[in-house]
Each structure stands twice: as structure tokens, then as C-alpha cells.
């Protein structure tokens, strides 16, 4: 089971390596904002492991703890990735890049996560009827409307401004589909192996899902974020991370619509703490980004606090 876990994790890691270049080229070809490309294309593709893993765990393995833990744990790990990468590549990021449309996804992910905390408490207990899925429908509608508004932001580049040496849009789409297929297959294998790990060890499904499975499914975000920040591209990096987090929360809403009853009634206390912690970490990142946009500062206390919070929450969970 550990061999299958490592095999799936490596497949996700290497497939994710090439996604940032494809997304960057796609942004230049289409003329769409790089923050939007980061949030939509990168967010969607890098969230494929979470989607497939959670669907497999909840619907086919009947392991809600593993599936929900995977999503909430992935969101925590994603924010920790961004905080750590900002610390490492701080000198390559221009102060003026902090306030940009990419922070739109930070606000959206905070709103959806807070609404989800409310749903968890409102829907706790026995089934109360068809209307209990209205919360998930609201989340998906909010996401769709938000992405439509976000797509209105255009970059100065023209649609026809393909640089010499770039692949065509059609080739990029084909490559994204191929890499996405690899990630899907690896996500299924990953969910199966993590379910076996949880059943054959003394670790809980929530812990396995929110740590091991979450870290493995977040490898694309890890690779993409590092490669983007190596070039100081904080806009796409932020759009990628919080776009992925937003997609992840929508995965819970999507699975809820296919789940018998409501998945929110089965969310445990520790999982709710993970979700609430992601809201806190997102808020800290947003505060730090706002301060850096207003004045140049070398203080990175917000990122350090985020990383400490991440370590403390898993020490508590274990």
C-alpha cells in the first residue's frame, strides 16, 4: 500500500511540473489576465487529484473522513506552500504586485469556507429534506458568478499576440488534457492506497486524509508555486493556490449533491477545526499582502505564523 502511495504521489509530482509553463503560455495566447489563468486553469488542473481522490474515497470507498480530510488538509497545505515559498523568494517579488486581481480568489475562498462552517453546524444531525442541498448549490453558483466576474479582467496582451516559439492554443490544450489524465489516474490510485493505510495502521482516516493524501494531491500546487515564484510571479502563484482552494471547497459541494443525504452532517469536529484554520491562515496571508502593497517591508511575520499554525494543527490532530 505504501508503494502504491509513493507511485501515485510521484506521478502527480512530475505531471504537475509542466503545468505552470502551459498556463503561462495560455495566458499570453488568450490575452486573459495571468491571475485569472492561475485561478481557473491552474486551479482546475492542480485540483484534479483532490477531485478524483475525494470522489473515490466518499462514493466508492464510503470513507467520508478520508475524502473530507483530503480537501481541508489540502487547503491548509496549499497556504503553507505559498507562505514558505514567499519567505524563500521574497527578494524576487515586487511590492506593487501584491495588490492585484489574484487576491480576489483569497476573498472568495474565505467567504466559501466561512459559509461551509455555517452549513456544517446547521446540517448536523438527521436528514431534514431536499432543501439541505441548497447550501451546496449556493456555493457552486457563487463560484460560477465569481469566476465570470474575474474573467472580465483582461491583460494588455492581444489574443493574437502569440510569441515566437510558443505552441498554439490547441497544442497547449491537448497537453493539458494529457497531463490531466495522468493526474486523474494517479488520484484514483492515491485514494485507494490511503484508504488501505488508514485501515491497516493506528492512524485515523481524518489524519491520513488531511496529511498524507492532502500533501500528495497538493504536489502540483507545490511544483507550480515554486516555479512561478522563482520568476517573481506572485500574481499567478496566489491565483493558483487560492484558486485551487476555492475549487477544493467546490469539490465538497459537488460531492454533496451526489451523496445520499448531506455530507456536511458527517463532518467531524477535528475536520471543522481544519476548515476554520484555513480561514485564519488565508486572513493572515491577506493582511500581509495588503501591508506589503502599502509600504516596502522586510518583515515576514505573517508567513512565519502561518507555517507555525500548520505544524501546530497537525501536532494537535495526531
Task: Place the predicted regions along the sequence by residue.
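Hydrophobic alpha-helical segments, chiefly the membrane-spanning helices
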Residues: 1-318
